[in-house]
């Protein structure tokens, strides 16, 4: 509901009180809502209830937008655009993961497979579901995580940075195996996985199965990371041709020129 242009404004005293009470959403709709209430002869309790419902709904929308922005999602994709039939992840597995019970249990999710097989899309759509349930998500690429470690090493605040990351109930680390892994990135991955162990959920996408992480980072560090990551993890392996490449070859990757 939005304020109608012809609806009389609120009395100044009432508007000021609503500002002091931090009720911006109810204040915005109040003129129109009060006009409707007068015309339809609402009971006073109905007016109060309607204003409170608008405020609660507006706060919910604002908090959701804040969580989405804080998550750092790469594209904004959701399951509204997801085709479960195209994915090589079994449909029952997709459905089970979408319940988010694994996040509630602080379990991990690893999706590994070739590029273009929907790993990032699926993780982002899951992350969107998580924020819609009122929980927080933190999204990183491994390169970004390495940069964070390097930036905080100078003043010895890496541990504090990891603690801040783990304020989120779900931490997503995307696209492992696409680029060479720096020592900072390897350390960042270990630190986050270690700190999250049995306390938060990690969702990870990779071109490699975690068993092959010792090809990307020092064996000792890889072993310790994978041990903690996989102990309580669901592992899904994707396969098949790149969806992006298939769409491009079929002429579906662009809007036709006219």
Functional labels for PLM-detected ranges:
Residues 124-128:
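A conserved segment at the C-terminal end of the G1
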Residues 98-106:
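Phosphate-binding P-loop
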Residues 15, 19-74:
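Interdomain "pre-motor" coupling segment immediately N-terminal to P-loop NTPase/helicase cores
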Residues 77-98:
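N-terminal pre-Walker A segment at the start of P-loop NTPase domains
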Residues 106-122:
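Walker A/P-loop nucleotide-binding motif
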């Amino acid at each position: 509901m939005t304020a109608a242009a012809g609806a009389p404004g609120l009395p100044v005293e009432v508007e000021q009180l609503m500002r002091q009470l931090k009720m911006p959403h109810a204040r915005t709709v109040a003129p129109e809502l009060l006009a409707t209430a007068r015309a339809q002869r609402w009971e006073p309790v109905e007016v109060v209830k309607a204003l409170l419902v608008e405020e609660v709904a507006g706060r919910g929308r604002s908090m959701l937008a804040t969580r989405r922005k804080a998550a750092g999602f790469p594209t904004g994709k959701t399951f509204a655009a997801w085709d479960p039939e195209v994915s090589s992840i079994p449909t029952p597995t997709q459905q089970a993961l979408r319940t988010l019970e694994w996040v509630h249990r602080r379990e991990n999710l690893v999706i590994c497979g070739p590029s273009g097989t929907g790993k990032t899309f699926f993780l982002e759509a899951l992350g969107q579901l998580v924020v819609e349930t009122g929980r927080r998500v933190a999204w990183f690429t491994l390169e970004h995580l390495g940069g964070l470690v390097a930036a905080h090493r100078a003043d010895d605040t890496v541990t504090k940075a990891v603690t801040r990351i783990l304020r989120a109930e779900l931490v997503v680390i995307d696209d492992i195996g696409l680029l060479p892994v720096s020592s900072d990135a390897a350390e960042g991955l270990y630190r986050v996985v270690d700190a999250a162990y049995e306390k938060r959920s990690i969702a990870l996408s990779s071109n490699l199965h975690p068993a092959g992480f010792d090809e990307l980072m020092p064996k000792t560090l890889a072993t310790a990371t994978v041990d903690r990551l996989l102990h309580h993890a669901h592992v899904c392996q994707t396969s098949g041709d790149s969806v992006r490449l298939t769409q491009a070859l079929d002429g579906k990757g662009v809007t036709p020129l006219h």
